[in-house]
Regions:
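N-terminal Rossmann-like dinucleotide-binding module
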Residues: 1-47
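Active-site loop of classical SDR/Rossmann-like NAD(P)-dependent oxidoreductases
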Residues: 35, 273-287
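Contiguous beta-strand/loop segments that form the cofactor/metal-binding neighborhood of enzyme cores
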Residues: 179-180, 185-257, 286-295
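Short, conserved SAM-binding/catalytic segment
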Residues: 42-50, 110-114
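Short acidic low-complexity segments
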Residues: 51-63
Length: 318
C-alpha cells in the first residue's frame, strides 16, 4: 500500500520533501500548493506529472489525501494544521510549530483531542546521530552527564541556499534561533526530557524588522546544564555542533550528522558510512512516518514535544 501526500509549501523544504517522496516506495505525491505562482511553476518543471494547480484547502479535504505535509512559513502552520484536523487527516508539520505560543498551545490541544497521527519535522527525530546520542545516554555510556554545549555560527543569515525565503531574515517569524537552534533543543528534550530556561541574552541589528545576530542562553534539563552560543556574521565556515560531556565518555555531533566520541584523548569519528546523508535521513524519517500512519511505534516528535521547544525558543527571543 502507498500513502498519498499533499505537499503544502514549495520552498526549499517543500522541494526536498517532493524529491524524497518521489523516490520512496511507500508514498505518492497527490499534489502540491504554494501561494507564490513562481514556486508552483518551478515545482511543475521538476515534477511534471504532479498536480500543482489544486489549492491547499481542496488538497486537504480530498478523499485521496492520506497525509498533509505543512512546509509553509511558521505563522501559517496553524491554519493548515487546523484544516487538516477538520478533514481528519494525519499531519507532518515543519518546525517551529508556530510563533505565537498561545496559538500553538491551542493547536496542540486540538491535535491531541483529534487522536490523529501527528509529527513535527525535527532533524533529530529519526536521524542516526540523534539515535546514537540517546542510545549512549540510556546505556550509561557517558558515566555521569555533566553538561551539554550547543555552538552555532553562520557567516551569512539566511544561508545562501535560503536566500529566496525572505521571511527567514525577519524578526517576526525568522532567525536562526527558531530555524536551527530548535533542532538541538529538541534533541536535548528527546534525551533528557523537558528543559527550563535559566538565563538568556539576544542581540539584534539596528533595523527593528531584522532577526537576531547573537543569542546565548543557559538551560537545565534533568539537572544537566545546557549552554547555547549562536551568532551570525563574520567570514569563515559555518559551525553547527552539540556536545554531550560525560565523566566516562563524551559525544558530539558536528555538521548535523557527523558523530565523534572521546574518552579523554582526541575526538574519534564514529559517523556511519552512508552514501548520501541527506537522503538517508529523509528516508529514515519517511519510514517512521509510515509507522506513524499505520499506528505502529515510531520515534517522531509530536506537537506536544514541538510546543515545549517553541516555548523555550520564544522565551529566549522575548
Amino acid at each position: 500500500m502507498t500513502y498519498r501526500v499533499a505537499v503544502l509549501g514549495l520552498g526549499v523544504m517543500g522541494q526536498r520533501m517532493l524529491n524524497h517522496l518521489a523516490l520512496h516506495e511507500k508514498f505518492d505525491i497527490l499534489g502540491g500548493w504554494d501561494a507564490v505562482p513562481a514556486a508552483r511553476d518551478h515545482a511543475k518543471a521538476l515534477h511534471p506529472t504532479v498536480d500543482f494547480d489544486t489549492p491547499a484547502d481542496a488538497l486537504i479535504r480530498s478523499g485521496e489525501t492520506d497525509l498533509v505535509y505543512i512546509g509553509v512559513p511558521p505563522m501559517a502552520h496553524a491554519g493548515y494544521a487546523l484544516a487538516a484536523i477538520e478533514a481528519g487527516k494525519p499531519v507532518l508539520c515543519e518546525k517551529p510549530l508556530g510563533v505565537d505560543v498561545a496559538d500553538s498551545r491551542a493547536l496542540t490541544q486540538r491535535m491531541e483531542a483529534s487522536g490523529l497521527p501527528q509529527a513535527v519535522n525535527f532533524a533529530y527525530g529519526s536521524s542516526r546521530a540523534g539515535e546514537a546520542i540517546e542510545t549512549a545516554y540510556r546505556s550509561g555510556e557517558f558515566g555521569t552527564l555533566v553538561g551539554v554545549d550547543i555552538r552555532q555560527h553562520f557567516a551569512v543569515w539566511p544561508r545562501p541556499w535560503q536566500a529566496q525565503a525572505k521571511w527567514l531574515a525577519l524578526r517576526q517569524e525568522g532567525g536562526f534561533v527558531r530555524e536551527v537552534l530548535s533542532h538541538f533543543l529538541y534533541l536535548c528534550d528527546r534525551v533528557l526530557g523537558p528543559a527550563t530556561l535559566d538565563s538568556f541574552d539576544v542581540r539584534h541589528p539596528a533595523d527593528p524588522t531584522l532577526c537576531e545576530t547573537h543569542a546565548s542562553a543557559r538551560l537545565t534539563a534533568a539537572g544537566v546544564p545546557i549552554s547555547v552560543a549562536s551568532s551570525s556574521g563574520g567570514v569563515g565556515p559555518d559551525l553547527v555542533e552539540i556536545t554531550f560531556w560525560g565523566t566516562r565518555k563524551s559525544h558530539r555531533i558536528t555538521d548535523w550528522y557527523r558523530t565523534e566520541e572521546t574518552e579523554g584523548g582526541p575526538w574519534v569519528e564514529t559517523t556511519p558510512v552512508v552514501e548520501d546523508f541527506r537522503r538517508d535521513g529523509a528516508f529514515r524519517q519517511l519510514n517512521q512516518i509510515v509507522a506513524m500512519i499505520e499506528g505502529k511505534p515510531h520515534t517522531l516528535p509530536d506537537f506536544r514535544a514541538a510546543l515545549r521547544v517553541q516555548e523555550l525558543i520564544e522565551a529566549i527571543l522575548a
